[in-house]
Amino acid sequence: MSDTTPQASPPGASPSSPETHVIDFRAAEQLLAARDPRGALKLLDSLIAAHPESMSARLLRARAFFASAQLRSAALEFELVLEREPDNAFAHFALARTHERSGRPVQARKHFRLAAALDPQPDYVAAARFEE
């Protein structure tokens, strides 16, 4: 880890305390933003082991998988989020991007269109290509 890597689990904090989990989540966000998805995954794996129902942690882990080109793992994680939150437009859009990057255009188009239908923001609508 570099000197600029966010430190997880402050001294004196229990490895499984709620405070530690929040710090680890925020550190994972920072690592992903700093283009260190593998570092983010290390923090998120233990966080999700402690809180498997946390969809925000799972969504962040899916993004980290995508950023590190672990596309199958990313797709599985996005699908898990969508099982619990079928109206999550971002998860549909991100799953579509994952399918697109994996060379599965039919599956990608389906999720691009679902994302645009749930949240008609310009990026989602453009990707859905409704005119085709």
Name the predicted role of every residue range.
Residues 1-23:
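Long, contiguous interaction/recruitment modules in multidomain scaffold/adaptor proteins
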Residues 34-42, 68-80, 102-114:
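Structural signature of tandem alpha-helical TPR/SEL1-like repeats
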Residues 60, 94, 128-129:
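Canonical tetratricopeptide repeat
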